Regions:
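NAD(P)-dependent short-chain dehydrogenase/reductase
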Residues: 14-75, 79-90, 104-109, 113-120
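Core catalytic loop region at the nicotinamide-binding pocket of NAD(P)H-dependent oxidoreductases
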Residues: 60-65, 89-101, 124-126, 175
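Amphipathic alpha-helical segment in the mid-to-C-terminal domain
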Residues: 4, 42, 46, 79, ...
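Amphipathic terminal alpha-helices
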Residues: 160-175
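Catalytic tyrosine of NAD(P)H-dependent dehydrogenase/reductases that use a Tyr as the general acid/base
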Residues: 2-5, 74
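Active-site helix of classical SDR
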Residues: 8-11
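C-terminal "lid/loop" region of Rossmann-like NAD(P)-dependent oxidoreductases
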Residues: 64-69, 98-99, 107-114, 121-140, ...
Length: 175
């Protein structure tokens, strides 16, 4: 693991498995990849960019988006789909198993930003802020959800473009 967050996730999975094996606790572990949507905290990249766009549209900031590394690839899924996946994991998942939850589609942070910029009529400059560059960042995170799909039949229903539109609209209503 490259971060303390990743270490904590591995520890949680190990504890869940041990409680399942040792005490028969019906644990089902889910590894939800990036999940996004309205009400997402502004410290997360999608929400942070959407908030900056909304603030620029409202005249609260210059038309400049401050960014970090745009080359990283992530698997973004709408949080509303992820909540359905959690429910199905409880209903249909096999105790003791681990399931990946995501779209299975990788998009760069740049692609996500371009999508948001395409939803505004403003001409917004993109500026790299060195303070936003992470010292240890995983370059590629894309889920293989075939095991979860086979167990539950789940697949995402909300298009990424709709998720980003809803997220930007959320921030437009709040700035």
């Amino acid at each position: 693991p490259l971060s303390t967050y990743a270490v904590s996730k591995v520890a949680q999975e190990t504890l869940a498995f041990q409680y399942h094996r040792s005490y028969g606790l019906r644990t089902v572990v889910t590894r939800a990849f990036n999940h996004e949507g309205p009400r997402r905290g502004h410290v997360m990249v999608t929400s942070n960019f959407a908030r900056q766009v909304a603030e620029a549209e409202a005249g609260l900031r210059p038309p400049v988006i401050e960014v970090g590394d745009l080359s990283s690839v992530r698997d973004w899924t709408d949080v509303r789909d992820v909540v359905k996946a959690y429910w199905l994991a409880l209903e249909r998942g096999t105790p003791g198993e681990v399931y990946n939850i995501g779209s299975g589609v990788g998009r760069s942070v740049r692609e996500m930003l371009d999508l948001l910029l395409g939803l505004t009529s403003l001409d917004i400059e993109v500026r790299v802020d060195p303070a936003r560059l992470r010292p240890s960042d995983v370059k590629l995170l894309v889920a293989d959800c075939s095991k979860f799909h086979a167990a539950t039949g789940w697949q995402p229903e909300i298009a990424f473009e709709q998720t980003m539109r809803d997220l930007l609209d959320y921030w437009r209503q709040r700035v």
